[in-house]
Amino acid sequence: MWIVFGAVFLAGLGMSWRMVGNPDLGFQLNAARYLLSHGDVPRAEPFLYTVPWSRYVDLQWLWQLSIYGANQWGGVLGMNLLCVGYTFIASAILLIRCRNWCGGIGTVSAGFLLFFFMVNFWDFRPHTISWIYLSLVLLCLERHFTGDKRAVWCLPLVMLGWVNCHALFSLGLMTIGLWTVGEVVEACLAKGEDRAKSFKKVYRLIGAGALSGLVCLINPYGWEGIMFPLRQFSLLTSAHIAKDSVFGINEFVPLWGKTLVFSQYGRFCLPLNGVLLRLLFIGVGVGFLLRRPRWPAPVWILGVAFAALYLTAVKNWSYFSFALIPYAVTGWSQRMLPWRTRAAMPTRVFILALCVLLLLLMRVDWWSRATSGLGSGLAYSPTGHSRGAAETIRRAGPEVRIMNPHDLGGWLAWATGQKVYIDGRNDNYPERLYRESVATGLAENFKALIEVIRANVVVARELGEGVWIETLAKEPNWRLVFRSDGILVFMRNDLAPEIPALGKENVAGGIPSDFVAWDRQLQLEAAKPLPGWWRALPFGQLVLDGVAGQSAGSIFLGRSEEAQAYAWAGICKNRYFIVELWVNLAAAFEMAKEYRLADFCWDTILRKVPDKDLQERAEKARARRNMADPRPYQEEMRRRGLR
């Protein structure tokens, strides 16, 4: 079995070897830098100029110092090794709990651990250290339940560390409280001497739990720090816009809140993340219910609570896993006991083969893209961590006021050393600020906001903020100064005039020269087939490069020929009919008033993919032809813009 577990951990290490896309990393590093430079944790809002009066409760300071130190020592590699190390320590404690319940660890434990590694996003986030603390809390409680009188007194030490590493220390207090309720139920159901012994255990647990709550006051914010998780809980249980299925943040959406999409514009899609997250819930839930005799009351109460947390917000999948996988392993192990001897070797071979396959899929860049949308290899994702954009902003000096998307705020503040409009700390600033940023999907709201906040720098993404791009491209007092990897930076003309504006790209020779040439070439390209379903599977993956975003960005900038060139380059080099590129080409023709060519594109698209959404786009595009001053293209076509 040691070979099997070694292969599982090796597969986990291999799956962690992916690009960094975590939007929170910037403000985590920034907070550590602030602490080291000021000698204290931040208290007033340090990173946003929009809500300077807001309080910043930063209970993650110890974890932030560790990730900052790892970054200073080894960059991305150092941070990856640190977080993988945290994950592996938590996994080792999980296996100890599996052994305690099952009398040993076998292939079922290895299978569940490998499945956890497959679902894991391998982000650099404080959840990794919270997994350790949650596992330790549960280990202490379970040993106390089985008669260990000393284990429960380790809880205060665990909680003292947890409260200074992550705001979700509240999960530890919740777990202790729920387990105590369960032990009270067990004590009430006991009889005779067992009843008296059970209540002694309850009193001991209540004492240790009370002490655990008191030591949580030993944090930089005292009582305010203990109360902070209530803000997070209200976000999860309220109608906060962050939970909205359209405008919200993916990790706050309920598990079943989003429909799995298996087809997009005639192409088969494999929503691997959504499938794995649902299978995890089902596999753990069924295993939990299979155990005989039934679980004692503390485990039942804990199971219901963590299942509810997972169903409420998908971000809680990992806590659900670390809490309940040992119980699921116990249930499945009991059910598979009659086949244990016959199935042991085939199961081990299957797990080993799956580990090898996962490493191979990482090697060919499929698994990381299918699960996180990012390539493999330890490097920053350029779309979420643009060094070029940060360097351009730094050149503008200290007078910048940055208007930015929600996901880019943390990195921009860290990389530029400047305050930003908004970042990903949704539980630390008012919901109004996030609603305000969402409302900038309408041009009039965006124009009004940049005047109110006096922004002189705007950072936008080609595939996220098309309305911003199109609005600023038409404003005479703004100029485009940076464009790369899907990120655009605009500056007011009176800011850093030494930074030149970017002009149009020279596309001469990149597109057909006249209508006849266009017509002939379009006929040939339109004959290409749609990608088959197997193109979404390993070794047949269809990976669209940045040309779709580049052509969309040029549309928003009002550069028709440039947009045509980008879209046409993508169409010509691809073996298949890619709808997004044809939509962008049609939009570029609309902009140039080449309506016959635009109609050919729309008709071809709808003939190949009779989709209602595409039909609506075509109708809106044709209706715009007679408008004297149409609204921004992205605003007219779709909230989320072109791809």
What is the role of each PLM region?
Residues 36, 41, 167-290, 321:
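Transmembrane catalytic cores of multi-pass membrane glycosyltransferases
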Residues 81-101:
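Transmembrane-helix motifs of polytopic, lipid-linked glycan transferases
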Residues 94-116:
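Transmembrane-helix signature of polytopic, membrane-embedded enzymes
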Residues 143-160, 200-207, 297-303:
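Short hydrophobic alpha-helices at membrane interfaces in multi-pass membrane enzymes
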Residues 367-407, 414-643:
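C-terminal luminal/periplasmic domains and tails of membrane-associated envelope-modifying transferases
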